[in-house]
């Protein structure tokens, strides 16, 4: 009897054996290091003495951290809505092109089917290309475009000899401008991030769009629903589960913009693009591990609260 119960337990819990390696990996490379970071945030780096919340107070009062936190928040608030809206529009456009290709296939219109499929393939190549470009290549592109002797300045000087807008540009730009050291640097950073991760979000939106049954659209079309009504009452409500994932991943990806900025402008870039990662990098170089640990815990707490609130609001509306 005991042998039978033992066999039943083994059959009931086979999933734990598959989850164990994953749990060990997350613990070794995630949970345990984070617990050590939390511990270090309450101790001084030099002598290892316990200082309580002193490190947190120093971080909050630090001017560099305050500037970086404001810039990072501004960057996320600006980038995420632009990225989500633009990627959703392009994903819906691409989905419509694929639907038209399927309709032409049913009507045996080979020429138009090939045209639509070719257009879809061209769109996919355009939005997936930035994902394949290494960060070092993006940095080279930035320097070619926005350096004081780069393409943008050359183009403006070429236009300065023309009438109208050329004269205006010649008045505004009397010398070569290093665009990454001006207020325009923030806009360049936003554009670069959206350009880099646009394809990533389009792929996620496409996964959600392809999961919506086409029969719903056909039934709505038979009932006289137009494109706008099907978009607002069918497409967007069915994309809610995917939207949660897209928002979270987009926010996490926004912290990866530091690589390009650091490689272009170094540890102390123009103040509008001085991000939290710059603070962490500078503190790491000066071995201020206690401050860096406290700031990391604070950032992790803010992100966790944001994710929980977002998840709660999603569940409440569903």
Where are these regions (language model features)?
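A structural signal for multi-pass alpha-helical bundles of membrane permease subunits
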Residues: 8-318
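Short Lys/Arg-rich cationic patches that frequently serve as NLS/NoLS or arginine-rich RNA/DNA-binding motifs
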Residues: 1-9
């Amino acid at each position: 009897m005991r042998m039978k119960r033992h066999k039943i337990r083994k059959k009931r819990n086979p999933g734990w054996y598959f989850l164990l390696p994953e749990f060990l990996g997350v613990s070794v490379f995630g949970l345990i290091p984070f617990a050590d970071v939390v511990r270090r945030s309450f101790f001084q780096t030099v002598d290892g003495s316990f200082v309580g919340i002193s490190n947190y107070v120093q971080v909050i009062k630090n001017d560099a951290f305050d500037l970086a936190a404001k810039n990072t928040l501004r960057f996320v608030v600006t980038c995420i809505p632009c990225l989500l809206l633009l990627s959703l529009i392009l994903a819906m456009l691409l989905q419509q092109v694929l639907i038209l290709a399927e309709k032409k296939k049913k009507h045996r219109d080979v020429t138009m089917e090939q045209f639509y499929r070719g257009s879809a393939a061209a769109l996919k190549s355009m939005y997936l290309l930035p994902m394949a470009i290494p960060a070092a290549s993006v940095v080279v592109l930035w320097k070619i475009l926005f350096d004081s002797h780069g393409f943008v300045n050359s183009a403006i000087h070429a236009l300065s000899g023309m009438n109208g807008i050329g004269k205006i540009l010649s008045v505004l730009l009397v010398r070569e401008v290093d665009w990454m050291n001006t207020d325009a640097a923030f806009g360049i950073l936003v554009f670069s991030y959206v350009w880099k991760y646009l394809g990533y979000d389009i792929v996620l939106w496409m996964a959600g769009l392809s999961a919506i049954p086409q029969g719903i659209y056909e039934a709505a079309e038979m009932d006289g629903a137009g494109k706008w009504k099907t978009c607002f009452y069918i497409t967007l409500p069915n994309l809610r589960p995917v939207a949660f994932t897209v928002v979270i991943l987009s926010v996490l990806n926004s912290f990866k913009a530091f690589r390009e900025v650091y490689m272009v402008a170094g540890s102390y870039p123009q103040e509008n693009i001085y991000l939290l990662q710059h603070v962490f990098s500078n503190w790491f170089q000066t071995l201020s591990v206690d401050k860096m640990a406290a700031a990391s815990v604070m950032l992790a707490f803010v992100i966790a609260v944001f994710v929980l609130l977002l998840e709660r609001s999603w569940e409440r509306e569903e």
